[in-house]
UniProtKB/Swiss-Prot annotation:
Residues 295-502 form the MCM domain. Disulfide bonds: none annotated. It comes from Bos taurus (Bovine). Residues 679-688, 727-739 have a biased composition (Basic and acidic residues). This is DNA replication licensing factor MCM3.
Length: 808
């Protein structure tokens, strides 16, 4: 037995010597010697080693490292500590252990959670997946020091479990007494702890077999690897696959829980901070100077080139990506700089496609849908921790998208309670939680881009925008811009769209020949942490314009060039940093245009507002003008920026409402027939038309086509063909009749009872007259009813319109 231990020690020392020779490569290329020096200067203790380099120098040792990870990694880490001590002895004493992280090509050991089987136990594997869950970071004791006051001795105890590289786990009993039953005091300052976190990685949905649920695996992160990732990140985790026995009632069952003990974590998703070279900065400066006149239009045209038209919407989305300037005033108030946009329109007008483009372009973007997300899922939820049973906060989509964009599709399918939850986020940029003993405030400074369908499925142009949208004013005022996107029947437009869509379907990626079979399934999987065909030169050389493709971009026009997506991403990232200042001229213009917007809806008869014009609209104009100035890389918000912002708001805030002319003609013919039957004179008819010009619309038309009447007025409609002269006579009589206060009070009580019985906010005039006089000893005449209603209308208690009484 002793010989075996000695043999193991000999093998361990031999492995340690091999790894030390590999690290000490001064005579070769000196790669790892320079890496260790960088590690010391950066005050780090984990060295990332490429398996390909080890395989090139010592293939046998590389194979043993991948297949017998625990013993080999212990030897490798000891060799690293010896090598660090040879370079800087004082630095080596600062840390008890130095760690090795692996990267490179793993071949058959590059797996997904589904293909991670028992044959990979104790091997180094590379697993790809999406992070679905992250536990809290907790301290884990590595070494505890205890002092005995009675004997004045110090006791030290080390702890190791199955998640560490040590072969045999130690006892987890924390000592409180020594061998002679003397009490011990823990010296917390001398004890050593390490950070510990557990994350769950799930198989990528595109790589899961059809019709099967994606599988997941738990990953243990220690020390410097904690908090490297967050839920939703696509990652590659390199680590050792190990099984942990599960004890139940003192017995170990035959099935084991498996975990991955990570030694390196690498993000696969695009970086929040794109890498810039000096060449990129020079290109961005040159582009902003040479195209200073039409740079905003040029960038807006290049947004989502696969979508035809929607020029104003693309300009607004560019403003959303650039954002305004956020301000925190001295009195504690906060002025948001994020721009929120709502797209409402018919099906198949590319609303969801625009959202998908923003997801690909914005540095941080979180997608959600109206039906699949709740209020707490968007803001923050209080959950119970599985390990400790404590209550803790879990961030929602808007908190995760802090300083980014939240894209909400099918916004109209959300319930009113869930929509109310995002009110605070959209204006204040934060989430306040006060429940289950937790009071917290989380930052959620994100822009909201939402898409919704109208109330009736398709947009009804004969109804006002507010009736079509069907959302509360308190929510609509928080959206800076609301666009109504219609699917209109225009032969010329339809021809252009069909030509564009057909070109998109005929487009083939570069390198594919026409007529070649399209590959089934996904592209070829790269079984390495880095793409072997990737060269750093490709990353640095970012082209400003895309190469023209007749299928992708259509027939080439003289001055129309498309900015490439990579350059657009970098340009937006640089432009967002600029904080332009309003000039006196632009501030005066915005103030003047704001007052004009407030009064515009009362002047124009055939247009209606899509959302209320409030004081928030003034801030919207400032934010849009600031975003336009950022696109020009300007330090000031000039008059041209303010004019562009006003043009966007004018387009988004007002929508034309059509009138049903054919039906109006038909109704007027019916009216004339009714008047002939009653044998009205020509003079009375002229007086009637004069009065009709004064009132907004005809009474009969209102009775038959009123959207607000929820009572059974349809049964009464045929009876409302009496000539309108009686109404005019009643109004004349009502002017003569003076109603006493007691009669008015009795009428108000009877009217309230009528509304209560009807369970509605509106009642027809005929039904009102019958109900008021039903059980009344002193019935009201029609003149008294008209006089009482006019008095109540003056006091803003009711509203009478087109023969229907509305309760305010």
């Amino acid at each position: 037995m002793a010989g075996t231990v000695v043999l193991d020690d000999v093998e361990l020392r031999e492995a340690q010597r091999d790894y030390l020779d590999f690290l000490d490569d001064e005579e070769d290329q000196g790669i790892y010697q320079s890496k260790v020096r960088e590690l010391i200067s950066d005050n780090q203790y984990r060295l990332i080693v490429n398996v390909n380099d080890l395989r090139r120098k010592n293939e046998k040792r590389a194979n043993r490292l991948l297949s017998n990870a625990f013993e080999e990694l212990v030897a490798f880490q000891r060799a690293l500590k010896d090598f660090v001590a040879s370079i800087d002895a004082t630095y080596a004493k600062q840390y008890e252990e130095f760690y090795i992280g692996l990267e490179g090509s793993f071949g058959s050991k590059h797996v997904s959670p589904r293909t991670l089987t028992s044959c990979f136990l104790s091997c180094v594997v590379c697993v790809e997946g999406i992070v679905t869950k992250c536990s809290l970071v907790r301290p884990k004791v590595v070494r505890s020091v205890h002092y005995c006051p009675a004997t004045k001795k110090t006791i030290e105890r080390r702890y190791s479990d199955l998640t560490s590289l040590v072969a045999f786990p130690s006892s987890s009993v924390y000592p409180t007494k020594d061998e002679e039953n003397n009490p011990l005091e823990t010296e917390y300052g001398l004890s050593v702890y390490k950070d510990h976190q557990i994350i769950t990685i799930q198989e990528m949905p595109e790589k899961a077999p059809a019709g099967q649920l994606p599988r997941s695996v738990d990953v243990i992160l220690d020390d410097d690897l904690v908090d490297r990732v967050k839920p939703g990140d696509r990652v590659q985790v390199v680590g050792t696959y190990r099984c942990l026995p599960g004890k139940k009632g003192g017995y170990t069952s035959g099935t084991f829980r498996t975990v991955l003990i990570a030694c390196n974590v690498k993000q696969m998703s695009k970086d929040v901070q794109p890498s810039f070279s000096a060449e990129d900065i020079a290109k961005i400066k040159k582009f902003s100077k040479t195209r200073s006149k039409d740079i905003f239009d040029q960038l807006a045209r290049s947004l989502a080139p696969s979508i035809h038209g929607h020029d104003y919407v693309k300009k607004a989305i560019l403003c959303l990506l650039l954002g305004g300037v956020e301000r925190d005033l001295e009195n504690g108030s906060h002025i948001r700089g994020d721009i929120n946009i709502l797209l409402i329109g018919d099906p198949s007008v590319a609303k969801s496609q625009l959202l998908r483009y923003v997801l690909c372009t914005a540095p941080r973007a979180i997608p959600t849908t109206g039906r699949g997300s709740s209020g707490v899922g968007l803001t923050a939820a209080v959950t119970t921790d599985q390990e400790t049973g404590e209550r803790r906060l879990e961030a929602g989509a808007m908190v995760l998208a802090d300083r980014g964009v939240v894209c909400i599709d099918e916004f109209d399918k959300m319930s009113d309670m869930d929509r109310t939850a995002i009110h605070e986020v959209m204006e204040q940029g934060r989430v306040t939680i006060a429940k289950a003993g937790i009071h917290a405030r989380l930052n959620a400074r994100c822009s909201v881009l939402a898409a919704a369908n109208p109330v009736y499925g398709r947009y009804d142009q004969y109804k006002t925008p507010m009736e079509n949208i069907g959302l509360q004013d308190s929510l609509l005022s928080r959206f800076d811009l609301l666009f109504i996107m219609l699917d209109q029947m225009d032969p010329e437009q339809d021809r252009e769209i069909s030509d564009h869509v057909l070109r998109m379907h005929r487009y083939r990626a570069p390198g594919e020949q026409d007529g070649d079979a399209m590959p089934l399934g996904s592209a070829v999987d790269i079984l390495a942490t880095d793409d072997p065909n990737f060269s750093p030169d490709d990353q640095q050389d970012t082209q400003i314009y895309e190469k023209h493709d007749n299928l992708l971009h259509g027939i080439k026009k003289k001055k129309e060039k498309m900015v490439s997506a990579a350059f657009m991403r970098k340009y937006i990232h640089v432009a967002k940093i600029i904080k332009p200042v309003l000039t006196q001229e632009s501030a005066a213009y915005i103030a003047e245009e704001y007052s004009r917007l407030r009064s515009q809806d009362s002047m124009s008869s055939d247009t209606a507002r899509t959302s209320p014009v409030t004081a928030r609209t003034l801030e919207t104009l400032i934010r849009l003008a600031t975003a336009h100035a950022k696109a020009r890389m300007s330090k000031t918000v000039d008059l041209q920026d303010a004019e562009e912002a006003v043009e966007l708001v004018q387009y988004a805030y007002f929508k034309k409402v059509l009138e049903k002319e054919k039906k109006r003609k038909k109704r007027s013919e019916d009216e004339s027939d009714a008047e002939d039957e009653v044998e009205k004179s020509q003079e009375d008819q002229e007086q009637k038309t004069k009065r009709r010009r004064i009132c907004p619309s005809d009474a009969k038309e209102g009775d038959s086509y009123d959207p607000y009447d929820f009572t059974n007025t349809e049964e009464e409609m045929p009876q409302v063909h009496t000539p309108k002269a009686t109404d005019s006579q009643e109004t004349k009589e009502s002017q003569k009749v003076e109603l006493s206060e007691s009669r008015l009070k009795a009428f108000k009580a009877a009217l309230l009872e009528v509304f209560r019985e009807a369970h509605a906010q509106s009642v027809g005039m005929n039904r009102l007259t019958e109900s008021v006089n039903r059980d009344n000893e002193e019935p009201f005449s029609s003149a008294e009813i008209q006089a009482a209603l006019s008095r109540m209308q003056d006091d803003n208690q009711v509203m009478v319109s087109e023969g229907i009484v509305f309760l305010i």
